[in-house]
Each structure stands twice: as structure tokens, then as C-alpha cells.
Amino acid sequence: MADLAAAHPGQVTLLGYNYLRSPAFQAARALVADRVIGQPLAFRGVYDEDYSADPTLPWSWRMTHQGGGLGALGDLGCHLVSVMVALMGPVAELTAMTQIAVPTRPSPEGPRAVENEDSALALIRFASGAQGSFATSRVARGRKCRLQWEIHGSNGTLVFDQENMNELWVHRGGDAGFTRHLTGPEQPDFAAFCPAPGHGFGFNEQKVVECRDLIRAIQGTAPCGPDFAAGLTIERIIHAMATSNGRPVTLEAAHEDA
């Protein structure tokens, strides 16, 4: 798909990494770009859900390499990577491990093997020299959409949790603690839905903003992303995590393996 898009440079492409459209994320990206928290030093990210935590959940094609591809990395981890790269820049190297927590699932023919990962952990070195940690799971009981991340900078810290998606927590050097920033109409994408603060911006609104950005890009009035090329970068990262087996992988090697 990325090669096809490159062969047709006039075509607009967009992938549905909609968490990049939340007002809190947009505010965080601006704070990072403006160096409000100084030089980013470290990223800590988690994306956990529990939709596969029940061991009696029936086997499905999504649990196979041929039909479903990757497991938690493909369902959840790619979204965390999209946020991570947008905030921290390119990944240079990573070391990861994966786990299949429930090796078999019931089916009408009897127990069938689960082939793709239920969870994954990774340590990351960014091209900037910053470091990161990454975790994702589809068997984390009690977690519904815990896309949680924080950035430690030389002069502050940002903290976000998708389960409280209208809040961004900010610490600046010298502060005694964190300040809660509640998203509101000062973010244009929020104001397009509601002129009053505190009323909340939801998951579906993120998708509407995403569609608007695609339409604007087709009209030629504004660029949008991530496009297919950026999506290929995300795929290379999660496939590097899937094949690392505890060994360091450079993104050049991940490119060759993809």
C-alpha cells in the first residue's frame, strides 16, 4: 500500500489512528513542540484492555497468524506506537518480548491453539537519544481502554490516560505537583462540537475530526496524517517487537524483516 501510494503522489492516504485527534493529545504535542517541558528524555506508554482475559472466550480466526496477523500488538500496540512516534520522533532500536497467556481456546472441534500474542513489553531507544518503555495487553483484567502515557522532560512531565480523555496532567519544573488541564473550547476541535468547557469530547468525535481532516486533504486545503508511509513505519516497529524475542533490533533490521 505504501509503495502504491508512493507511485501515485497526488493521492491522499490516511490511516485510522484516531487517538491522535483528541484535543488533549493535540495540546500535549504543542507543549512538547514548544519545549514547555524541556527536552523529552523518556516515554512510558501502556495500552491495556481485557477483551480476551476470559479463558473460556471461544477461539477465532483473529487468534491465528494467517487470519489475524499480530495479536495485542496489532489491535492495541499500533495505536500506542502512533502516539509515541508522534510525540517522541523515530525509534532507533528496541528490545521486546511477547507472551501468549491463554495457549488454547475452546472451539466446536475442541481446544485450538492461540498463535498470536496476548501481551508484549518493549524497551526503546529513540533516534533523539531518549529512552522509552512500552507495554500492551488484551488480557489485563479490569482495563477497558487504558491508553496511558507520560513523557518525562528536562523541565517537566506530561501524563495522559484515554479512560479520562479530557484531562492532561502537566508538571513544570519548580511545581510542587501536577496541574490538571481540562480540555475545552480553547482547542479548536473541541469548540467545533461544544462552546462550553467541561462537557467532554468523546471517542466518536475523534473519528469525526479524522474524517474532516481527510476531506480537507482531498480538497487540498490542509495536509493530514498518518499516511500509508507513516503507517508502514508503525508496522515495522510492531513487527520488530513481535520478532525481537529479547534481542535488540534496529529499525533497519525491522525494515528488512517487514
Where are these regions (language model features)?
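Predominantly a Rossmann-like dinucleotide-binding segment in NAD(P)-dependent oxidoreductases
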Residues: 9-14, 19-114, 168, 248
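C-terminal helix-rich "cap/oligomerization" subdomain common to oxidoreductases
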Residues: 2, 6-7, 12, 199, ...
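Glycine/proline-rich active-site loop of Rossmann-fold NAD(P)-dependent oxidoreductases
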Residues: 115-116, 130, 143-147
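Alpha-helical structural signal in soluble globular domains
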Residues: 1-7, 31-34, 125
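Conserved G/P- and acidic residue-centered "switch" motifs that form tight phosphate/ATP-binding loops
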Residues: 35, 129, 221
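Glycine-rich phosphate/pyrophosphate-binding beta-alpha loops
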Residues: 78, 135-143
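C-terminal glycine/acidic-rich active-site capping loop/insertion
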Residues: 103, 107, 113, 121, ...
